[in-house]
Amino acid sequence: MDNNNNNNNQQPPPTSVYPPGSAVTTVIPPPPSGSASIVTGGGATYHHLLQQQQQQLQMFWTYQRQEIEQVNDFKNHQLPLARIKKIMKADEDVRMISAEAPILFAKACELFILELTIRSWLHAEENKRRTLQKNDIAAAITRTDIFDFLVDIVPREEIKEEEDAASALGGGGMVAPAASGVPYYYPPMGQPAVPGGMMIGRPAMDPSGVYAQPPSQAWQSVWQNSAGGGDDVSYGSGGSSGHGNLDSQG
């Protein structure tokens, strides 16, 4: 009996089904190829689009700073100083206005209009449109913190409807713009410019003498309509009636 018990206790262990030295691995089936690629591709497209927009805005402000530092003509302006003065005097507490104040206000209004236009145009490009609409301006105001004082006058319903429509299509409202439809703001000739893009022109200067390349046809039509449609506002760099000297507008 004792020998039998010893033999039973000394039985060899069962042979492993795996070869010696091999590691046991669990085979996990790969995820569906469609869903992962869509998520990754969409995130990359969105990130690339944000980088493009930030680059365009940085170029715009870099050029504006350079232009402000080099300005030496304080008599001709993009916006009529008479209108600026009239708005400033609408405040009953304002009794007198110095000669420099309307000039600074005119430049500030010009920069405000230009930046808001650029941001609105970017939204139009995201939605693959070549026409600037009021919902593009509303979207630019809603997206930008410094424009939050205009939120109360933004048609929020139109933005919500557009975002819902984009979400239903699976685009999330962000579509990569075409390579030829990216609005770049080009510096004057003689300064480095980023090639391969369009630009947002300025109405008060001759594009052939200022920009490295002529503006796009879309922006040409916008500026031409603005220049020909106003009653009092004149978009000329010369001494037109819309921008008179400070002496003549006092």
Swiss-Prot record:
Q: Where in the cell is it found?
A: Nucleus
Q: Where is this region: Disordered?
A: 1-35, 209-250
Q: Which GO terms describe its cellular component?
A: cytosol; nucleus; plastid
Species source reads Arabidopsis thaliana (Mouse-ear cress)
Show the InterPro entries listed in the entry.
Answer: Histone-fold (IPR009072), Histone_H2A/H2B/H3 (IPR007125), Transcr_DNA_Rep_Reg (IPR050568)
In UniProt terms, what function does this protein have? Answer: Stimulates the transcription of various genes by recognizing and binding to a CCAAT motif in promoters. Involved in the abscisic acid (ABA) signaling pathway.
Name of the protein in question: Nuclear transcription factor Y subunit C-4
Q: Name one GO biological process term.
A: positive regulation of protein metabolic process
Q: How does it assemble?
A: Heterotrimeric transcription factor composed of three components, NF-YA, NF-YB and NF-YC. NF-YB and NF-YC must interact and dimerize for NF-YA association and DNA binding.
Q: What is known about the tissue distribution of this protein?
A: Ubiquitous. Present in etiolated seedlings.
